[in-house]
Amino acid sequence: MELKGLSKTIGLLVLTLLFFASAQQSNAQTVCSNQTGTNNGFFYSFFLSSGSACMTLTGNFGGGNYSTTWSLGSSGDMVAGKGWNPGSTTKVVGYNTGNFSPGSNGYLALYGWSTSPLVEYYVVDSHGPFTPPGGGAQSLGTVSTDGGTYNIYKVSKSGPNILGNGPFTQYWSVRTSNRSQGVNNTITFNNHVRAWASHGMNLGTMNYQIMATEGFGSNGSSNVTTWQISN
């Protein structure tokens, strides 16, 4: 009788685990075309200029998990991630990369936009062999935060943006050494905001803000989980 009871208990446990695994899988969503939306309580954004790329959104690890794969040819660009809309200048973000394989040119960054002024910003924590932002950037010193040093850059751009097409400015903080994978990391965004402001680089009204994977002219993949530590 005891063995029969144990067998029933094990059987129920297996069925329960299968149910939760199935429910978790049912929350998965694959995106391969330009769009924004919500998934498991997080805002997401996916942009692809050319080439091939997809993002899979899941409910794993509190809902902030996503993975990407990309093959972008020589000039394709992909920006994909999960986060918040609107973002916040004081947000403290946690994240963990189960995988970040950027190929020849890819970044892992806290990424977003503001309007009035129209600004695209990056806090790059890891990147591939190519170090962003590349030519034409104005170097404006450094900021030390979250256990590392970041180089600050400002770039004037013109092209597609969240308001259409036209001029905008990029603000960059690029960490001098890549973050470790498979561990919990923190980005204290306000430390970058204050450092940028000291160089006259002010943000306006916050638009979306994501923990992003970007690939440019490369092949790669990522698996990222993000969460909010404080707003």
Where are these regions (language model features)?
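Short, flexible beta-strand-to-coil junctions
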Residues: 97-104, 113-116, 177, 210-221
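Sec/Tat signal peptide C-region and signal peptidase I cleavage site
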Residues: 22-28
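An exposed acidic His-Trp-rich patch
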Residues: 116-181
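N-terminal segment immediately downstream of the Sec signal-peptide cleavage site
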Residues: 29-81
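Bacterial N-terminal signal peptides
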Residues: 11-21
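Extracellular-facing segments of soluble proteins and assemblies that are Gly/Ser/Thr-biased and enriched
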Residues: 78-145
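Bacterial N-terminal signal peptides that target proteins for export
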Residues: 2-11
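Long, compositionally biased interface segments
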Residues: 182-231
